[in-house]
Amino acid sequence: MPYAQIEDGVRLYYELTGPDHGPVILQLGGGLFGRHNFGLVNDGFRERFRLLSFDARGYGASDHPRGAYSIEGWAADAAGLLDAVGLDRVLVHGTSMGGMIAIAFTAAYPERTIAACADVAFAKPDVYRRTVFRGWRRMVETMAWDDFSDHVTTQAVGARFMESPEGENIFQLVRDIVALNDPYTVRHACLAMENMDLSSSVPRISRPLLMTNGTHDILCPPDLAPSGLGARKMAELNEVIELVEFPDIGHADLVECPADATRIVGEFFERALEAALASPPLTSADWSPPSR
């Protein structure tokens, strides 16, 4: 199993798949699904891109140190992973909590970012969303794991999709993946999202950032109440940020419309690569890890 040890000694499990010389997409998974969030879009992306998928600190086969977790801390871990595997600049694709990490990463590490997509994410939760995450945190502490998984599924996946042939097994799928998690990490992930405030980072973002949001998402909608900072407002504040909405779904575009998600994000990355290659010093060597 491939592991990378980052600066503070934590070992991260990672997989690097796809065409050897393809542009690399660093994938940042969500707080409950982790790297499994991308399971239905990986094959589509691998037709053109190389994928760097990993278990974040506290998840899966990576180390699970006890202590505080934060969105900015997970972004720093991602930069450490790039150092460890010998990658200079990458495309970044994060979803849900991973989208929040993508925002933090793009702001903090512009020299490592060609372009980024923050899927179903925002920069700061409003009162409603903070209450949702606090509720999740309490559920993790008190509810049966399967009951918590079912509750989250009803918030993340649309009612019509649940009753469609594609969504027939969605509840069991979510149960199986959520069961892989360490409850300690999930609790701290909820706390990290509850307390997150990337407002000051948004104006500093200098690399192209695509926000993809479902119009009917109750967890991370494009528009938040005044105390929050959602995708639409982010795009108004910074000209390098753009928003694409999925008009018929909620939080789970990578599950409910994976082909559309792959196409929209892939085309955005292609345009960003074209622009970056036209503006040296970026070359294809920047995203090619050394032979091992």
For every predicted segment, state its role.
Residues 103-108, 112-144:
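Flexible "cap/lid" loop of the alpha/beta hydrolase fold
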Residues 6-64:
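Conserved HGGG/HGGXW glycine-rich cap/lid loop of the alpha/beta-hydrolase fold
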Residues 94, 98, 102:
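Gly/Ala-rich beta-loop-alpha elbow adjacent to hydrolase catalytic centers
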Residues 127-131, 146-203:
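Conserved alpha/beta-hydrolase catalytic His-Asp/Glu region
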Residues 37-39, 62-68, 128-130, 222-223:
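Conserved catalytic-core motifs of eukaryotic protein kinase domains, centered on the activation segment
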Residues 43, 52-93, 263:
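Active-site loop/oxyanion-hole signature of alpha/beta-hydrolase fold enzymes
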Residues 238-292:
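Catalytic active-site module of serine/aspartate enzymes centered on a nucleophile-bearing elbow/loop
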Residues 43, 206-249:
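Conserved loop-alpha-helix segment in the C-terminal half of the alpha/beta-hydrolase fold
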